[in-house]
Amino acid sequence: MLYRSALRASCGFTPRLASTRSRLASSLVLLEHKAGRLNDASLSAVTAAKATGNDTHGILVGSMAEVEGVLKEAKKIKDLSKIYLATSDAYSHSLAEALAPLLASIVPTKDVSHVFAAHTAVGKNVFPRLAGMLDSSLVADIIALDPSRGTFTRPIYAGNAVLTVKSSPKDSVKIVTVRSTAFDKAAIADGSADVEDVEILAIESPTQFISEELTVSSRPDLASAARVVSGGRALKSKESFDKILDPLADSLGAAVGASRAAVDAGYADNSLQVGQTGKVVAPELYVAVGISGAIQHLAGMKESKMIVAINKDPDAPIFQVADVGLVADLFESVPQLVQEIGSIKA
């Protein structure tokens, strides 16, 4: 409690949560965006919010230049009835020190019972601070919820167990981050959400945005790709990693991923890591090449719709979750597979 009080004081914010309100009527979703496009993970958060049975509202935050193009897309989200719009240069780049106080000032005045965000870098940065400011618990990385019981389900122990939790009755607002692979994306179709501007909160943030360096790739984004080809330590070197995986990924139109062992060995960049400490993916097709299947890796890909494993060890744990397994030398089988795919395409 002392920490939360200090956090609120440092931001000049005092919550105004009504103690006599009998029913909190809406769920609010933080709509992330980048380069003029909505983040697909936020669409999954909208689906989770809709499951509460409340009216579902979204909030777009950023500079006018950032949100101008996104707003048109956001208004079409099928399950949103209203979008709150907060435009200011102070909200550029989604810094937690600016966003959390803004959200905390909006929640008490808009009859909000739940606040949702995707369990992304932004959600993981903003929502713990928001929970502290609202004196509520944070329920992180949920994969299911039961509104009738007021419970949430989240994975623990690298996905080997699931935990059902219920936030405290003292929490007037539920603060929730959502594992995007566990919920379908809300459709961007025939929605017609109303737009309401919200008051800009003047806060002197101790944090300033300096710069951002992004890895540019012609391939699909790993986190949202429909197909993923991942390589493990069995590829033996960075040269082999690229030589074997790139043609297969290109032939399938897939993103490239890697196990932690491959990343630690220097075969692939950290941004390509799939697993508990990397990205969690659930593509239509996941091809694991030379990956043994450590628990930490399985936690990041076992929800994939179709898992294909190629490994010369028949006892590799990856085969326990694979839909299709090939026990073979990857240095021989993968080039043959690429050749066969090319023949089919021709």
Curated annotation (Swiss-Prot):
Bound cofactor: record note: Binds 1 FAD per dimer.
Main location group: mitochondrion
Listed SUPFAM superfamilies: Adenine nucleotide alpha hydrolases-like, DHS-like NAD/FAD-binding domain
Entry binding sites for FAD: 285-313
Entry keyword set: Electron transport, FAD, Flavoprotein, Mitochondrion, Transit peptide, Transport
Superkingdom field: Eukaryota
Similarity comment: family membership: Belongs to the ETF alpha-subunit/FixB family.
Function summary: The electron transfer flavoprotein serves as a specific electron acceptor for several dehydrogenases, including five acyl-CoA dehydrogenases, glutaryl-CoA and sarcosine dehydrogenase. It transfers the electrons to the main mitochondrial respiratory chain via ETF-ubiquinone oxidoreductase (ETF dehydrogenase).
Subunit (UniProt): Heterodimer of an alpha and a beta subunit.
Protein name: Probable electron transfer flavoprotein subunit alpha, mitochondrial
Organism field: Cryptococcus neoformans var. grubii (Filobasidiella neoformans var. grubii)
